[in-house]
């Protein structure tokens, strides 16, 4: 896999607060190689390492996108939800930004059944057929549709498990990460100083609580995916 230049600068990472970790009491000793200092009771992430692993992640997603692979972006906490949806839509990726339903990947047949139900209800609603039902029946189906839209709206076009999963918060999305490990799906994960860097295929040391930090990381990955997709379109 060829290495490319992704315009990753230490200055912009510092401005985004990527280097700010958690308090020194809330840390995972496995993160020691990725921490450069302590400052006012918090750990400071080594941004040189962040740049290196972010660049590797961009290389990976570019290569995968250039071969037509499918991506899933997962980030369900409030700070990340909107950023995840925007990034995924921009790069034509699937996403989960509300609750992760246990077994979403490992029990794919159940997820597929839910997706079929979701698509059928959307078709019926668009055709106006729900409004022709008795009020009680229509209300029940509309509630089902609303719930399915909330939890499955970001994966409504997904027809199989993804080829690569991008995880915004390791601890928040631990169940999703474990499902990927079980299925052998490659993962890219933002890891703060309280995380385990060994759980993902590519771990990017970064502040996973600051909106600016999450946005910058996602923007770099999305740009690489879009570039890869353009390459795939030009050279199918």
Curated annotation (Swiss-Prot):
It is found in: Plastid, Chloroplast. The keyword Plastid applies. One of its GO terms (cellular component) is small ribosomal subunit. Pfam families: Ribosomal_S2 (PF00318). InterPro entries: Ribosomal_uS2, Ribosomal_uS2_bac/mit/plastid, Ribosomal_uS2_CS, Ribosomal_uS2_flav_dom_sf. One of its GO terms (molecular function) is structural constituent of ribosome. One of its GO terms (biological process) is translation. The keyword Ribosomal protein applies. Its main location: plastid. Keywords: Chloroplast, Plastid, Ribonucleoprotein, Ribosomal protein. Belongs to the universal ribosomal protein uS2 family. This is Small ribosomal subunit protein uS2c. It comes from Citrus sinensis.
